[in-house]
Regions:
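Transmembrane helical bundles and short interhelical boundary loops of multi-pass, membrane-embedded
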Residues: 347-379
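Membrane-integral, polyisoprenol-dependent glycosyltransferases
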Residues: 1-344, 371
Length: 379
């Protein structure tokens, strides 16, 4: 017997609900001095000194991040004459909602509306995902572009891509790089071939990473690096390309952690839904449930990126943000297959994920409305 559709099953309703419940948090919290205020200061310094491609903080080079997010801060500073934290926070919240929409649209052929609701709300309320959706950082922007690139790859892989998708794929990859740096290319370049190897279709790499992808990526990066060199000279370009990439990967000068760091941080970074998503992700290994090609791809991306980032010297929990979506949605597809097979446990878990997520969002509303000081201490 089919269940009647509910209001919560509508993506537009869920998106509006997320926005309304997080609105007090967005309006009443204070900006953090270590990261958020620093980005505003970098934007002010760039506007004052006429820098556009090269970033500086208190006169010192700040090649840690590409300029895209700072450009957004600069744009609103120029338009409004002051910084508006609420508008800037939307450039984290809106990409988070777009990421949910992409994953729901992508997985709609394997997930019912009820399971899509559970998957997207549980992803939204993962600790680090929710936190990244309300702070002034570029991580969610990068996650959105990575998710778009993965969806575009899947359309190419399954023969559903339009001619434009062959150009959109490298464009999304570039925008991910331009948002956060080299971590933006790691999933499309390193994790996709892992999946293709397991599927014995490695030759498809020539279609995904063919001449169009490399041409557009080289052209856009070349333009960026040329203007960086023109404005900041060889020293800034060297800092951007080598010190901030190879230095962080091999012998990090910031956030250096042991190789097993993510083995324990992933549990609280995805909390509370790591307790469901991660164990369920291992079920196909034990033949408890069959994994479709889509699930295999999502899990291959999550597993390979986890291993790759564990081998990188510099580690922060938020670096795992791009794999939260694949993990949550893959686990929900597996749970729905179990429910279709008569599993009562899967039904219970779906309800826990749905109502637990709504409870977390309601708690965020109350805290933002009545206890903003406590929220500031958390961030």
């Amino acid at each position: 017997m089919e269940e009647k559709p509910r209001l919560i099953d509508s993506f537009l309703f869920r998106a509006a609900l997320i926005f309304v419940l997080l609105l007090p948090v967005l309006l009443r919290r204070d900006l953090t001095p270590t990261n958020e205020m620093k980005y505003l200061e970098i934007a002010d310094e760039a506007l004052r000194d006429g820098h556009f491609w090269c970033l500086f903080h208190n006169g010192e080079m700040y090649a840690d991040k590409p300029p895209l997010y700072i450009w957004i801060v600069m744009l609103f500073r120029r338009l409004l004459g002051c910084h508006c934290a609420f508008l800037l926070e939307l450039f984290s919240l809106v990409p988070a909602i777009v990421t949910l929409w992409v994953l729901e649209r992508w997985c709609s052929e394997e997930l019912s509306s009820r399971w899509r609701a559970a998957a997207s709300l549980s992803l939204m309320t993962c600790a680090w995902f929710l936190g990244s959706a309300i702070v002034l950082r570029m991580d969610m922007l990068m996650t959105m572009f990575i998710t778009l690139s993965l969806w575009t790859f899947w359309k190419m892989y399954t023969g559903r891509a339009t001619p434009a998708d062959r150009w959109l794929f490298p464009l999304y990859v570039f925008l991910a790089i331009f948002s956060k740096g080299p971590v933006g290319i790691m999933i499309p370049l390193l994790c996709i071939p892992v999946f293709l190897l397991f599927e014995r279709r490695f030759r498809f790499m020539g279609t995904v990473w063919g001449w169009r992808s490399w041409l557009l990526l080289a052209a856009l990066c070349g333009i960026w690096w040329f203007f960086v060199w023109r404005e900041g000279g060889s020293e800034y370009l060297n800092n951007l390309l080598f010190h901030q990439t190879a230095g962080r990967a091999v012998n990090a000068f910031h956030h250096k952690e042991p190789v097993y760091y993510y083995c324990y941080t992933v549990w609280y970074a995805m909390a509370p839904w790591s307790l469901i998503a991660i164990p369920v992700a291992f079920l196909p290994l034990f033949k408890r449930v069959e994994a479709s090609p889509m699930v295999r791809f999502l899990l291959a991306v999550a597993a390979s990126f986890f291993v790759i980032m564990s081998l990188v010297s510099g580690k922060i929990a938020v670096y795992l943000l791009p794999i939260f979506g694949p993990l949550c949605f893959a686990s929900c597809i597996l749970l729905q297959r179990m429910e279709d097979g008569g599993s009562r446990t899967a039904v219970i878990l779906r309800r826990i994920m749905l109502w637990g997520s709504l409870l977390i969002l309601a708690a965020a509303f109350v805290i933002g409305l009545f206890f903003p000081g406590w929220l500031n201490s958390l961030l």
